[in-house]
Amino acid sequence: MKKFALILEILQIKKSLSFEYTDSAYDAELARIRERFIPLVKICKEYGTAMRIGTNHGSLSDRIMSRYGDTALGMVESALEFLRICEEENYYNIVLSMKSSNTQVMVEAYRLLIVKMDAEQMNYPLHLGVTEAGEGEDGRIKSAVGIGTLLEDGIGDTVRVSLTEDPEFEIPVAKALVDRYTNRLEHAPIVDLSFEVKKNKSGLPYNPFEYSRRVSSAVKNVGGENVPRIIADFSKHDKITAANLFGVGYNYSVPLDKWNLTDQACDFIYLGKNKIDFAIPGTLSMIVDAANWRATDDYENTYPYFSSNEFISAKIKSTHLNFIGLTQKDIFENADVILKSIDKTCVLVLETKNTHAMAELRRIAIELMNRNVSNPFIVKRSYNSISSDELQLHASTDFGALLLDGFPDAIWIDAHTIASPQMINSLGFGILQAARTRISKTEYISCPSCGRTLFDLQETTAKIRSRTDHLKGIKIGIMGCIVNGPGEMADADYGYVGSGPGKITLYKGKVVVERSIEAEKAVDALINLIKEHGDWVEKELKFN
């Protein structure tokens, strides 16, 4: 506990040393930067060399932090300070990037950068990337949530996918993200926003520059203060058995005669016209087509799914929870009738078959928000005729973008012809985690290998993951070197950073805790550090 007390003391000292810059002190610091930066600008200008000005979310200066805080605005202003100096020297051969492993911050920063550049009549290309995205499924999902959201917005000129894997595995992911837009011009029409909203950015019913979840009224466990829910689609199964639930987070213990929930247990299962003839976990609810719901004998835990027309004409509805499918056509051709019929039991399922799916779902959500609809939203998207790898990226883009806008109270991925329920369920929870809207596992912020890397990143990441992957909600940064590591860990709770050949430095947040640990002992030292701070729990024993 002595080490823990020392860290707290260091944090208090750092806090007490922070101070507000006066305008004159701020300007003096800018002048110092200008003096040191201009020689580089002149050399680049002389030789026709391009420059990338990139802001790192975890490395903002004390001066920027004092005025703007650890925010997307701080990132943007930091880059603009250098950009203005370049323009004063008539140097314009520049690309900009906003680097963060936090997808919310990354997307906000790029959007805000464009607005700020427009205000100063600047127009520079943007390089997109989620820094230190990690490995495997998590790394691909996080990259797609961040990069894909901006590509959907029409933002971005170059792309870098940063994975803790061999470099050759990054290119196919980046290419798949970009290639999705090759034929996007063929999409079905989307109802345009009004001229007033376009001209007046504040006219949007949400703030695209700062994450805030849409305020909705709770219906049972959907919406309100509840975390976004996951709906598993079993409607295409020939017969549903207890074994089918194993893939969506429910394990049945024969010795204990009870269901056990994992941290990635789905919240609803959609049966369509199917039935279940066994006792399901008490925390799991069922959704069935409205016509089949009338014949059910479990009105307390089974809820109907209506089309909008079915709901308007229905004589029998659930007194607890009704799901209503809504399309763009429903909202823009029959909104008054539909919205008049909904009540406090209704959850709205926003659906589309448009190739440009995310934009249409966003447009439906905006229209409902402009009409002051407070019922919870579910976004539903069906996929077919693509590979499982493409599904991972496409779904992460479509759902991730809407989650970063703060819209959905639940997501519903229908991809039965492409992937297993287990993969789809894992994908759904991965998207929620990458968007930081529902945390169900440990998050690893790990860098790709480069010439500065001082240990085997893939091997070390695997070792750390095997020991810590049960620590839900903890963020661990695994960085190959001391050059970029501390900055790019950003908001990691713990850091494991290479500081020399065979040597590791451990961090608690951004504070160094221990230096020059032998690599063979470093993982154990990291575990001990986590334990000292009270964030450690033992892995649960699993009974079958």
Language-model regions: role of each:
Residues M1-E81, K220, A232-M358:
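Active-site beta->alpha loop and helix N-cap motifs at the rims of alpha/beta catalytic domains
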Residues K2, G156-D157, D267, P408-D409, ...:
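Receiver (REC) domain switch/active-site residues of two-component response regulators
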Residues E20-I33, I64-V222, F323, D330-L471, ...:
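Catalytic alpha/beta core domains of metabolic enzymes, predominantly
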Residues K45, M369, A490:
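Anion (oxyanion) recognition and catalysis
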Residues A176-K239, A265-F268, G272, M286, ...:
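Extended, intrinsically disordered, low-complexity segments
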Residues N251, L256-T262, G495, G502, ...:
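Radical SAM enzyme core and accessory elements
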Residues I482-E488, A492-V512:
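Nucleotide-binding motor/catalytic cores of P-loop/tubulin-like NTPases across gene-expression machines
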